[in-house]
UniProtKB/Swiss-Prot annotation:
Active-site annotation: 71
GO molecular function terms listed in the Swiss-Prot or TrEMBL record: NADP binding; shikimate 3-dehydrogenase (NADP+) activity
The protein's name in its UniProt record: Shikimate dehydrogenase (NADP(+))
GO biological process: amino acid biosynthetic process; aromatic amino acid family biosynthetic process; chorismate biosynthetic process; shikimate metabolic process
Source organism: Rhodopseudomonas palustris (strain HaA2)
Keyword field contains Zinc-finger: no
Top-level class of the enzyme under EC nomenclature: oxidoreductase
Catalytic activity as recorded in UniProt: shikimate + NADP(+) = 3-dehydroshikimate + NADPH + H(+)
Key words, A-Z: Amino-acid biosynthesis, Aromatic amino acid biosynthesis, NADP, Oxidoreductase
């Protein structure tokens, strides 16, 4: 199915964008929900991004996902919601009448994955977040929105952690990376937003022994599916939430905005994406 054939179509805009799993996810939902629609990949260089986005309908699309390196620029070219503004990046574009709006679905993807993987995780008042990059901003916004009272934010650059604390308020407490172990006792949630533990990256060296026995450990990395951090957490009997779950759940909102039906993250969909990851 192609843009302009009379059916609703959305796309992923990136540079490059060829290895995204988004088409696999959205085509699965279109097929299983019986919706005539399409989802394509559009590789658009930075110098052509503004023209493409501002003429999205002329290109045949009613909405889009946006990935690297365009997410900050997308924020400037659209009418962003509070989540996109707080995160500082937009990953989902949609029309509200003739107004092109944007949001960041990483926030609800992260929270929905926690809800599905570890129901009741939000009963804890304290959390520890590792890393202070773009992903951390989405995580912090979601945790604060959900009512977490205190978040220790550990980063190798304390200045970057302090900058996010200044942005999000006094409930976010910046700490040195080496102080992360001391923050674990009493923390009901630990979240890794760094690339440590990803295939080809150094391991995340952190002893989970100080965590409470009912804590939840989340890792945004999904290659490998089970990082060393998650393996250790499971070995200790802790509940876990992996990066693939977040990837799947963050796609839900965009699909709903474009195609008018709210899809579900199913075991079948997860198995489909796992098989695709294993084949690469």
């Amino acid at each position: 199915m192609h843009p302009g054939d009379g059916h609703t179509a959305a796309c992923l805009i990136g540079w490059p964008a060829a290895h995204s799993r988004s088409p696999l996810i959205h085509h699965y939902w279109l097929r299983t929900l019986g919706i005539p629609g399409g989802y394509s990949i559009e590789s658009v260089p930075p110098e052509g991004f503004a023209e493409f986005v501002l003429n999205l309908r002329a290109h045949g699309y009613s909405g889009a996902n946006v990935t690297i390196p365009h997410k900050e620029r997308a924020l400037q070219l659209t009418q962003p919601d509070d989540r996109a503004r707080a995160v500082g990046a937009a990953n989902t574009l949609y029309y509200d009448g003739d107004v092109l709006r944007s949001t960041n679905t990483d926030v609800e993807g992260f929270i929905a994955n926690l809800d599905a993987s570890a129901p009741g995780w939000d009963r804890t008042p304290h959390a520890v977040v590792l890393g202070a990059g773009g992903s951390a901003r989405a995580v912090l916004f979601g945790l604060l929105e959900r009512g977490i009272e205190r978040i220790a934010l550990a980063n190798r650059s304390l200045e970057r952690a302090q900058a996010l604390a200044d942005l999000f308020g006094e409930r976010v407490v910046p700490i040195a990376w080496t102080d992360a172990p001391a923050a674990l006792p009493g923390a009901g949630l630990l979240v890794n937003t760094t690339s440590l533990g990803m295939k080809g990256q150094p391991s995340l060296d952190l002893d989970l022994e100080p965590l409470p026995s009912d804590a939840t450990v989340a890792d945004l990395v999904y290659v490998p599916l089970e990082t060393e951090l998650l393996a250790e957490a499971r070995g200790r009997g802790l509940r876990t939430a992996d990066g693939l779950g977040m990837l799947l759940h963050q796609a839900v909102r965009g699909f709903e905005l474009w195609f008018g039906a709210r899809p579900h993250v199913t075991a079948e969909l997860r198995a489909l994406v796992e098989a695709d990851l294993a084949a690469k």
